[in-house]
Swiss-Prot record:
InterPro entries on file: Anion-transp_ATPase-like_dom, ATPase_ArsA/GET3, ATPase_ArsA/GET3_euk, P-loop_NTPase
Lineage, highest ranks first: Eukaryota, Metazoa, Chordata, Craniata, Vertebrata
Protein name: ATPase GET3
Binding site for ATP: 39-40, 43-46, 245, 272, 313, 315
Reactions the enzyme catalyzes: ATP + H2O = ADP + phosphate + H(+)
Residues that bind Zn(2+): 283, 286
Example of a GO cellular component annotation carried by this entry: endoplasmic reticulum
Length: 342
């Protein structure tokens, strides 16, 4: 007689936990796009800059892009960056740039349009067209960045993303752009009288409606190519950064579910700012914090047993400047060893 079903699992081996580092990401040479994101204030920028540093040691050329309007990578490396890729001091193959995708037609100053009623009407019509698809101006900004970056042939691009909502729009930008361009193509004849003046004002030269439509259509193949790459786990992955607190854990779960809907690969989580009490220096607050964090860490390890979960410590100092980022980056590859317990 067959053994009871429960007995079948008694001798089943425990699932080995995955390595608690980002070595799998560093070693995956096929990756071209790596996104680092999560809730605000969890240390995404420090982690993304550290990841870029480690990648620069094994790849020919690495670009880190900040899509967060706060532009913290300038603070992290203690070096001013712009919307043009700039070499990070101390590195030969690591570049950084900062963009603000939220700037679009709606952000153009009204003073430019005040002297010409035709231009003023044109701006309003373009804004109306953009509003038909929320996020199209932001998505077009992403599209232009992707077009430029693809032409630069970096080995891998790391995105230091804005908080979760912006990040999801970034990942969905190919769909938004396709819909938005379709809408703009439908109304191109309506806005034709204004296009030439608008293009001259924006420094795009003399251009009629058909020429503009042609340029927009040229963008679509790049958008579709990037969209396909984003959904290819061999080329794209997303690293979630969080802290061991309820709200951050909740946000991480929501983010992972949304990534799954977008068919974006994710199998790495960084739990940052962990407190490890020192036996020689008793601290009631540290002990209490450690207890709370341990509870959520246990939940994460149960919930994400098929993820690489890297655990990084809360440091007594800011991680700022290339040297400090370089030191911190080693924690991505070597599990942190807290002070020995009592």
């Amino acid at each position: 007689m067959a053994a009871p079903a429960d007995d079948e699992f008694e001798d089943a081996p425990d699932v080995e936990p995955l390595e608690p580092t980002l070595s799998n990401v560093i070693d995956q040479r096929s990756l071209r796009w790596i996104f680092v994101g999560g809730k605000g204030g969890v240390g995404k920028t420090t982690c993304s800059c550290s990841l870029a540093v480690q990648l620069s040691r094994v790849r020919e050329s690495v670009l880190i892009i900040s899509t967060d309007p706060a532009h913290n990578i300038s603070d992290a490396f203690d070096q001013k960056f712009s919307k043009v890729p700039t070499k990070v001091r101390g590195y030969d193959n690591l570049f950084a740039m900062e963009i603000d995708p939220s700037l679009g037609v709606a952000e153009l100053p009204d003073e430019i349009f005040e002297e010409d009623n035709m231009l003023s009407m044109g701006k309003k019509m373009m804004q109306e067209a953009m509003s038909a698809f929320p996020g199209i101006d932001e998505a077009m900004s992403y599209a232009e960045v992707m077009r430029l970056v693809k032409g630069m042939n970096f080995s891998v691009v790391v995105f230091d993303t804005a908080p979760t909502g912006h990040t999801l729009r970034l990942l969905n930008f190919p769909t938004i752009v396709e819909r938005g361009l379709g809408r703009l193509m439908q109304i191109k004849n309506q806005i034709s009288p204004f296009i030439s003046q608008m293009c001259n004002m924006l420094g795009l030269g003399d251009m009629n409606a058909d020429q503009l439509a042609s340029k927009l259509e040229e963008t679509l193949p790049v958008i579709r190519s990037v969209s396909e790459q984003f959904k290819d786990p061999e080329q794209t992955t997303f690293i979630c950064v969080c802290i061991a607190e309820f709200l951050s854990l909740y946000e991480t779960e929501r983010l992972i579910q949304e990534l799954a809907k977008c068919s974006i690969d994710t199998h790495n989580i960084i739990v940052n700012q962990l407190v490890f009490p020192e036996p020689e220096k008793p601290c009631r607050m540290c002990e209490a914090r450690h207890k709370i964090q341990s509870k959520y860490l246990d939940q994460m390890e149960d919930l994400y047993e098929d993820f690489h979960i890297a655990k990084l410590p809360l440091l007594p100092h800011e991680v700022r400047g290339a040297e400090n980022v370089n030191t911190f980056s080693k924690l991505l590859l070597e599990p942190y060893k807290p002070p020995s317990g009592k």
